[in-house]
A protein has these predicted regions:
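Basic, nucleic-acid-binding surfaces and adjacent catalytic neighborhoods in DNA/RNA-processing proteins
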Residues: 22-45, 55, 192-236
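Extended, highly charged segments
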Residues: 1-69, 86-89, 96-97, 102-103
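Phosphate/anion-contacting hairpin/loop surfaces
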Residues: 74-214, 220-221, 225-227
């Protein structure tokens, strides 16, 4: 299962590749489970939108768009994001945004055109390097320049949602998430205080509590406890 370090690796990889790219169209192979948005919302807020940033909070990725919407992605147990290049093509996308229809062509992307490599991250299996889409592909996003982003998920626990950017922080699980272990402002003292609030619980479940520390799962909880020479069933 991708945990915080793996999801951060995906964020960094996509942050180098996606900003500036314009969405031309999508193909959803597992609707509505993996991508529950209504087609009208996808057409209005995703088609023709330009990627502005790729962010992460805990194990959740956010691809921000210039429509003030974001693609929010949770890889869960077996999720992957795979970016592939292909021959460039021209596409025209009309949307009924409040600012009016716009035509998106290859020239719309020309100011950020560059030669780059493919990227893949998430759960390790053959879909990271194989032909796509395959049987695990849930969502395919085509960009105006011909590149594509595939959301693969073998077990179908992961999801992708299109949400207003300013509403993402209000999602229930986002409001409960604790401090980021990679944030330089996160102090060991604060972490210890949060752990101590779980009095009489075993220390490993306390590590796995996302309200205590963000993004830690079984792998890194085990590694941290091994490094500290603490048994997972030690009481807080």
């Amino acid at each position: 299962m991708p945990e915080l370090p793996e999801v951060e690796t995906v964020r960094r990889g996509l942050a180098e590749l996606l900003p500036g790219r314009v969405v031309a169209r999508t193909a959803v192979f597992d609707s509505p489970k993996s991508f529950p948005n209504a087609p009208a919302d996808v057409e209005q807020f995703l088609y023709g939108a330009r990627v502005t940033a790729v962010r992460r909070r805990a194990k959740v990725l956010m691809i921000d768009l210039d429509t003030q919407y974001s693609l929010v992605i949770h890889l869960k147990m077996t999720g992957q994001l795979v970016f592939r290049q292909s021959s460039r093509y021209s596409a025209r996308v009309s949307s009924n945004k409040s600012r009016g229809p716009r035509k998106v062509t290859q020239d719309f992307y020309a100011d950020t055109a560059r030669e780059i490599d493919d990227f893949a991250g998430g759960h390790p299996n053959d879909s990271l390097i194989g032909e796509l889409p395959d049987r695990s592909t849930r969502v395919q996003i085509d960009f105006v320049d011909g590149s594509r982003l595939f959301f693969n998920d073998q077990r179908k626990f992961g999801w992708m949602k299109l949400l207003p950017t300013d509403e993402v922080k209000n999602l229930p699980f986002m409001q409960k998430v604790g401090p980021e272990p990679l944030d330089p402002n996160t102090r060991a003292e604060d972490f210890i205080q949060r752990i101590r609030r779980r009095q009489n619980s075993m220390i490993k479940p306390a590590f796995l509590d996302q309200a205590v520390i963000a993004g830690v799962g079984n792998i890194y909880a085990d590694e941290a406890l091994w490094a500290a020479r603490l048994h997972p069933q030690t009481r807080v």
